[in-house]
Amino acid sequence: MLRTTASRKIVLRRGLASINTGTTVASKKASHKFRNTFWTIALSATAFYAGGIIYSQKNDKFGDFFSNNVPFAEDLLETYEHYHDRPTLFLEDSWDGLKAKSNDLLSGLTGSSQTRRSNRENIEVKKILSLEPLNIETENSDPQLKEIIGSLNDLINSLNDSNLSIPESEFNSIKKSNQNMLTNLSQLNETLKEALSNYMIQRTSEVITELNTQYENSKREFEKNLQKNLLQEVDEFKENLTKQKDKELEEKLKANEELLQAKHANEVGLLSITQVKEFNKIIKDKIEKERNGRLAHLEEINSEVNDLSKSIDRSSKILSKNEALVQLTFQVDEIKSRINNNNLPDVNIDKELSRLKLLSNLLSTFNKKSCCDDGDCCSCKKGNKNEGKEGKISCKCKPKTNPPSLLSVALDELESTCSGKKILSNEQIYNRWNLLADDFKTASLLPPNSGILGQLTAKVFSLFLFTKTGNPSNATDFDSVYARVGDNLRVSNLNDAVEEVVSLKGWPHKVCESWIEDARRKLEVQRLVEILDCEIRTL
């Protein structure tokens, strides 16, 4: 249809041209600026990248510069090196054939454009360029081939989107080239798959063969090492067993030898004992004869010597007891003088207590009674049935438990009262009572359940109170009690002062708790020291 219309236009133009109208018709020149510019840029870029890739393979410095500064140069170099280093060369040949066909196609397009430029006056039938994409199954194909097919499809889509109008002959040629390229790429894809499959089969067989060889070698080596280790272990076990049996045999021989030696020694010892007994019997008979003769008064002398030693022991005990009593009296007097000395603000009597405990324990040993009821110890009795063969007497009397003495009880109480604590003097106790004057006045104004406001109010109003001094009365108000306690402390009547303070109740009693504790400690120490002094004087 298009060809018939074009032929009619040509005939019409020729008919009109044969008519001499006196005017000349200028034929318009066919202009394809966009298409020519596109193909020029594409060919220039292809030549630039191809030359850069080729020269980069020869010069490493240029290759680094080219890949770092030119866009897409690094990806193209990696693609080229990938296909260049493959074990087979079928991809390179296929790519060269495809590139040659593309060059022919481009040259055909260029030649056709030049022909159209030379035939300015000829009018041809044109068609819009529309190429079909390359529909090739690339599911299991090479990744680089997938990229090439994708790039060609992008190029075909860009050509289709440009809506280029080309002559029918060129359109048919381009379409045929597209079909040939599709066929070649399909063949290339199949060839790649087949080559890859063959390569994998070959490589798999080589790996299996290599693994079998390694397995056989390792198996032989393992058997050899296992046999060697087993032989070595058997030799070691044999050697250890031999050593163990030799050692056991040696130990048994040594034990038998020691048993025989011990048996021989026992027999010799038994013989020696028998001989010693016979010898002792002979000696005893001779001594009895001598005793009945020249040593008849030896027993009397021995009894007199024993009586003398007993007298000396009794005298020594009496002297030691008297010395212990003297030292106890001295220590008690020392404690008395220290706790009654007003020049010392506080006194610590731990050292004196330790000496008193030591002397008390020593004195208790002297006062220890005999274990028998008659006053004599079993060891002093002669001809006792408990006397053994060697002359030792085992006392079978029941031990008597003596109750603790008053001295030890008083010392224990004194130690529990004063251990690690200081005893204040009378003057120090009086001074501390005077220091409680302000707090005592404040406490006398406080109600039973006072809060913070009550405390502050009592503190303020206590400033207006006066402390009562002088001859106290028998009244029970706080001022009279304070005055009586101060007067008793001034005359060293600590007992009455403590009774007055203890009788207080409420806040005044709570304020004086620490003072009561110190005063009671002083009174208890004084009473215990007096008890010790009386007990020592009665011993």
Swiss-Prot record:
<keyword id="KW-0809">Transit peptide</keyword>
<keyword id="KW-0175">Coiled coil</keyword>
<keyword id="KW-0999">Mitochondrion inner membrane</keyword>
<feature type="topological domain" description="Mitochondrial matrix">
    <location>
        <begin position="17"/>
        <end position="36"/>
    </location>
</feature>
<feature type="transmembrane region" description="Helical">
    <location>
        <begin position="37"/>
        <end position="56"/>
    </location>
</feature>
<dbReference type="InterPro" id="IPR019133">
    <property type="entry name" value="MIC60"/>
</dbReference>
<dbReference type="GO" id="GO:0042407">
    <property type="term" value="P:cristae formation"/>
</dbReference>
<keyword id="KW-0496">Mitochondrion</keyword>
<comment type="subunit">
    <text>Component of the mitochondrial contact site and cristae organizing system (MICOS) complex.</text>
</comment>
<dbReference type="Pfam" id="PF09731">
    <property type="entry name" value="Mitofilin"/>
</dbReference>
<feature type="transit peptide" description="Mitochondrion">
    <location>
        <begin position="1"/>
        <end position="16"/>
    </location>
</feature>
<feature type="coiled-coil region">
    <location>
        <begin position="172"/>
        <end position="267"/>
    </location>
</feature>
<comment type="similarity">
    <text>Belongs to the MICOS complex subunit Mic60 family.</text>
</comment>
<keyword id="KW-0472">Membrane</keyword>
<protein>
    <recommendedName>
        <fullName>MICOS complex subunit MIC60</fullName>
    </recommendedName>
</protein>
<feature type="topological domain" description="Mitochondrial intermembrane">
    <location>
        <begin position="57"/>
        <end position="539"/>
    </location>
</feature>
<dbReference type="GO" id="GO:0061617">
    <property type="term" value="C:MICOS complex"/>
</dbReference>
<keyword id="KW-1133">Transmembrane helix</keyword>
<keyword id="KW-0812">Transmembrane</keyword>
<comment type="function">
    <text>Component of the MICOS complex, a large protein complex of the mitochondrial inner membrane that plays crucial roles in the maintenance of crista junctions, inner membrane architecture, and formation of contact sites to the outer membrane. Plays a role in keeping cristae membranes connected to the inner boundary membrane. Also promotes protein import via the mitochondrial intermembrane space assembly (MIA) pathway.</text>
</comment>
